[in-house]
């Protein structure tokens, strides 16, 4: 049985240039969607899975929302339905997938009899040419719903309560599975022990997580996850995977190949237990991110000549950010606008930002460190602007609720 596994499409406007009146980053996402649809036409999977976060932003203007829904259906969902025996579309998180958008998709595609949209947990048996398969669907969950029952709980307690609930829900649903038929878990959650987009490891208490032991306890033959944008095999005995986003979304994705999985489930002969899963990763035509670094010598050379020291090959057609090290005097002389123009002329798709990584303060002022929190950083910034103590105190008071919410 052949399974195409994708997720985290994040269709919508992303930070980047506008070309011919269209957000060019959105067009990058559509190009990845079309590639997946083309590969599905070649592979003809028994089941195609979209494991949540089809859309990028839940709350957008009406015209943008209509464009997103239209492109999701015409460029992605309908082509997949034509190429696949079944298409599974899972609701992700509410800050990305809007419930009303999913209702609209459901209404417009009601003629697609092989499309299965899951906005609530459940188990469904699908019949394919390779045999029956069960889908255990576990859409994303808004932990804010628990605040009514546990008001005043801190973030870690809230995460642990939601984690206990969602793992119990998953175990409860698994009792509905027919163990004689292959089953696939489709979920949109963080899995404890998985690698985050920035390379760190998620632990229980940091987020609402599904435990690897819970996945193993369900007895499913394959687990297809969405939510984390870094493709990876998960740390459990069950074959379980994040497919990641098909397109790079930010600089956390730099240097990471993005795409989708093609899984094959091989069932044992009749009367013998067990299945085997074979997996292959297919890379999409993603838009690359690239960090262009400049040392003091590079900054001096550019300031003197107005020309880039070098234009590395990865810079071509990439979303570029600049990180530079120099003295305070060198920074004053650095023409950032001219640097951006030169990078674009050298082939960069878009220059996202030009920021110092380290500026040596010859006056001896202490440097900003990674240990400083937002409060300390704001105090330092206001001091640098030479804001009066009274005004600084007023601004700090206004910022306090926002900083607390962010923490």
Q: For the regions a protein language model found, what residue spans apply to each?
A:
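Conserved beta-sheet core of the metallophosphoesterase superfamily
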Residues: 191-272
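Beta-strand-turn-beta hairpins that frame and shape the catalytic cleft
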Residues: 1-4, 11, 16, 123-137, ...
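Accessory, non-catalytic peripheral segments of nucleic-acid enzymes
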Residues: 265-407
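Active-site environment of divalent metal-dependent phosphoester hydrolases
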Residues: 10-15, 56-59, 88-102, 124, ...
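Divalent metal-coordination and catalytic microenvironments
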Residues: 8, 33, 48, 53, ...
């Amino acid at each position: 049985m052949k399974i195409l596994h994708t997720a985290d499409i994040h269709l919508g406007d992303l930070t980047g240039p506008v070309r011919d009146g269209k957000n060019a980053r959105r067009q990058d996402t559509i190009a990845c969607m079309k590639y997946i649809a083309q590969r599905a036409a070649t592979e003809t999977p028994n089941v195609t899975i979209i494991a949540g976060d089809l859309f990028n932003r839940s709350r957008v203007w009406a015209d943008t929302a209509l464009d997103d829904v239209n492109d999701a259906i015409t460029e992605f969902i309908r082509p997949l339905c034509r190429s696949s025996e079944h298409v599974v579309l899972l609701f992700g998180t509410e800050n990305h997938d809007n419930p009303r958008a999913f209702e609209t998709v459901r209404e417009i595609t009601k003629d697609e009899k092989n499309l299965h949209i899951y906005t609530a947990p459940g188990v469904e048996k699908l019949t394919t040419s390779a045999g029956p398969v069960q889908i255990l669907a576990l859409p994303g969950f808004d932990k804010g719903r628990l605040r009514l029952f546990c008001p005043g709980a801190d973030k870690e307690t809230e995460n642990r309560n939601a984690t206990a609930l969602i793992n119990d829900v998953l175990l409860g649903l698994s009792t509905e599975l027919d163990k004689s038929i292959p089953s696939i878990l489709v979920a949109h959650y963080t899995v404890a022990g998985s690698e985050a987009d920035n390379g760190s490891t998620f632990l229980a208490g940091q987020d609402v997580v599904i435990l690897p032991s819970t996945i193993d306890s369900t007895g499913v033959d394959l687990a297809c996850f969405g939510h984390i944008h870094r493709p990876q095999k998960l740390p459990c005995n069950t074959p379980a995977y994040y497919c990641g986003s098909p397109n790079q979304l930010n600089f956390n994705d730099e240097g990471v190949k993005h795409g989708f999985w093609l899984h094959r489930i091989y069932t044992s002969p009749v009367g013998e237990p067990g299945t085997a899963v074979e997996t292959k990763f297919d890379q999409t035509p993603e838009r690359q991110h690239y960090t262009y670094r400049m040392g003091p010598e590079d900054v001096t050379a550019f300031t003197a000549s107005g020309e880039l020291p070098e234009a590395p090959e990865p810079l071509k057609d990439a979303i570029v950010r600049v990180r530079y090290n120099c003295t305070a005097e060198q920074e004053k002389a650095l023409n950032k606008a001219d640097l951006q123009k030169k990078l674009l002329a050298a082939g960069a798709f878009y220059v996202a930002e030009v920021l110092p990584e380290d500026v040596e303060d010859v006056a001896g002022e202490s440097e900003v460190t990674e240990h400083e929190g937002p409060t300390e950083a704001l105090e330092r910034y206001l001091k640098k602007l030479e804001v009066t103590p009274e005004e600084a105190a007023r601004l700090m008071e206004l910022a306090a609720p926002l900083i607390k919410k962010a923490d």
